[in-house]
Each structure stands twice: as structure tokens, then as C-alpha cells.
């Protein structure tokens, strides 16, 4: 596990925690997140990247294993369990908060060279998701859960996720299902 964190004063305590616990990390641009991810990948010689963001703390280990298997077996550039931007009518995707993305460092390099907007620089995989130049795949869910929101962007979101963790604690590697 490697953290890719913004180089700013707000992350000093996080950086201290990472150092104290001997967790690998790289600091980079706060606004050009694609650049930060790419530099992190190169620093640690990563061929592939599994992206889990701080606002989506609910990682399903079984889902991740299945996605890794599919990613390797299908030799694709990008795999995610989020909504496919080219399939706007599909409602069968995973709830916000369980987001997982797997992509190659080569794919990230190609997108970095093509990106022209600040929005795409700030949102690591938006360009990749919205471009047909990459071999992309989106994992679908069996049920419609578009209204379920488990990402952490507010205090209420954080309290909701804490309740979920407390229900399963100490077995925190619970499955989405």
C-alpha cells in the first residue's frame, strides 16, 4: 500500500502518521492529482495502480480480488466498479463509497500527456473513463443501488460509515454483499 498525498500543511499530521508507521507514501501537487499519481507510481515502480480514495473507505476484499483477476485475465487498461459514462441508462452499479479502480501506469501516462483541462488534472481517471482510446471495463452489480451513498464527504456520511464499521468490528474486512 502506498499513499499519494498532497504536499500541503493540512496533510502534515497524515505524513507524520505514515512516517511513524513506516507506510510508503509520496507527496505531490494538490491540484494536478494525475501528476501526483504518476510520480508516485514511477517512484515505487508500479506497473498497475489500485485506486482507493479517502472518501470511499469501504473496500470489499472479495470484490477487489475478483476485479484483479478480471483485470489480469482480460488484459485491459482500466477496470472500475463505478458507472460507465458511455452507458448512461445503466443503474446496476455499486453504491458510492465502495469505489475501486484498477489501471495500468502506461494508461495513466497516456492520459497525462493528453489531458488539457484543470478538471481532468484534478480528477485522476475522468479522462480515462471518458475516452475510448483505452480498453476499459466496468463491473456491474446485480441490483440497482444508485440511491445508496456511503462515501464520506460530510460529518453525517462519516457517522454513517462509522456505524457500519462498528456493526462488523472487529471483522472489518466484510463484503459488500
Label each PLM-derived region with a short phrase.
Residues 16, 59-148, 163:
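Conserved core of the sugar-phosphate nucleotidyltransferase
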Residues 4, 28, 52, 81-82, ...:
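Generic beta-sheet signal
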Residues 40-43, 93-98, 150-157:
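Short, surface-exposed amphipathic charged segments that create phosphate/polyanion-binding patches used
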Residues 1-7:
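Short internal beta-strands
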Residues 150-177:
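Hydrophobic helical membrane-anchoring modules
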Amino acid at each position: 500500500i502506498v499513499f499519494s498525498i498532497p504536499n500541503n500543511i493540512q496533510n502534515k499530521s497524515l505524513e507524520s502518521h505514515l512516517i511513524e508507521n513506516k507506510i510508503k507514501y509520496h507527496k505531490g501537487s494538490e491540484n494536478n492529482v494525475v501528476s501526483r499519481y504518476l510520480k508516485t507510481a514511477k517512484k515505487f515502480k508500479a506497473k498497475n495502480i489500485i485506486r482507493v480514495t479517502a472518501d470511499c473507505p469501504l473496500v470489499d476484499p472479495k470484490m477487489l480480488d475478483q476485479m484483479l483477476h478480471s483485470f489480469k485475465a482480460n488484459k485491459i487498461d482500466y477496470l472500475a466498479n463505478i458507472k460507465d459514462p458511455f452507458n448512461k441508462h445503466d443503474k446496476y452499479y455499486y453504491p458510492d463509497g465502495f469505489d475501486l479502480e484498477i489501471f495500468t501506469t502506461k494508461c495513466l501516462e497516456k492520459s497525462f500527456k493528453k489531458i488539457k483541462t484543470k478538471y481532468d488534472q484534478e480528477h485522476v481517471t475522468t479522462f480515462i473513463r471518458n475516452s475510448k482510446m483505452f480498453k476499459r471495463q466496468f463491473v456491474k452489480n446485480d441490483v440497482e443501488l444508485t440511491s445508496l451513498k456511503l462515501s464520506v464527504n460530510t460529518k453525517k456520511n462519516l457517522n454513517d460509515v462509522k456505524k457500519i464499521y462498528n456493526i462488523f468490528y472487529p471483522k472489518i474486512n466484510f463484503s459488500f454483499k
